[in-house]
């Protein structure tokens, strides 16, 4: 857009100023005789502005030349370049990513939208920016990171890593020890192994001698 305005300014100034100046005093030259013909395609040495047909448009209209002024290091993240043809010019059109609007709402006591006349003096104004979750920089809420809220509060015991929340709420003082019966142990013993039995037959223990 800036280059188009610059081109129009150059055209207006070229038409308003005189085309030829006197080489000696700088005064406008006299009118040529009717028999004298000046070629239009040949540029005169004392001509202030050359003919517009001799100026290459590729030097004036350079689309995208003002983009490095805003971001000289690199192109903006998320921009897309689409080639297009404008007459003899070949440029690139810059498309900005879709920007989501900023919502500003004024809420009353009951949470309803109120006008400026009905608002109290100490009104609350909530401002939020909608960010698409696929955009870079989007932050997920803490409840959606994969961990449960009740698990994030405290560490789990050793044997309760996969237990239900009802079991996680029990304190160490209320836990009951595991009781194994002899019948269950005998059923769980493999066939090739023998269980060690505690026998007290034939073993006597003498009390220590007491000195009187």
UniProtKB/Swiss-Prot annotation:
Subcellular location per the Swiss-Prot or TrEMBL entry: Secreted
Lineage: Eukaryota, Metazoa, Chordata, Craniata, Vertebrata
Similarity section: Belongs to the amelotin family.
Region (Disordered): 23-42, 141-212
Tissue expression summary: Highest expression in the mandible. Found in the basal lamina of maturation stage ameloblasts of incisors and unerupted molars. Also found in the internal basal lamina of junctional epithelium in molars.
Function: Is a promoter of calcium phosphate mineralization, playing a critical role in the formation of the compact, mineralized, aprismatic enamel surface layer during the maturation stage of amelogenesis.
Biased composition (Polar residues): 33-42, 165-178
Signal peptide: 1-16
Record organism: Rattus norvegicus
Protein name according to UniProt: Amelotin
């Amino acid at each position: 857009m800036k280059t188009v305005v610059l081109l129009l300014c150059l055209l207006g100034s070229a038409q308003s100023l005189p085309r030829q100046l006197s080489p000696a005093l700088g005064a406008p030259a006299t009118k040529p005789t009717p028999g004298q013909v000046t070629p239009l395609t040949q540029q005169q040495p004392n001509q202030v502005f050359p003919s517009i047909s001799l100026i290459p448009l590729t030097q004036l209209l350079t689309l995208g030349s003002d983009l490095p002024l805003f971001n000289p290091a690199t192109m903006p993240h998320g921009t897309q370049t689409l080639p297009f043809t404008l007459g003899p010019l070949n440029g690139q059109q810059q498309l900005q990513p879709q920007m989501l609007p900023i919502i500003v709402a004024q809420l009353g006591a009951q949470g309803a939208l109120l006008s400026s006349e009905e608002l109290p003096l100490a009104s609350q104004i909530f401002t939020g920016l909608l960010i698409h979750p696929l955009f870079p920089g989007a932050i997920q809420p803490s409840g959606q990171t994969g961990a449960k809220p009740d698990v994030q509060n405290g560490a789990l015991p050793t044997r309760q890593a996969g237990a239900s929340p009802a079991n996680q709420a029990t304190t160490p003082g209320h836990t009951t020890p595991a009781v194994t019966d002899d019948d269950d142990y005998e059923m769980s013993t493999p066939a090739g192994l023998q269980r060690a039995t505690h026998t007290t037959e034939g073993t006597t223990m003498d009390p220590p001698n007491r000195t009187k």
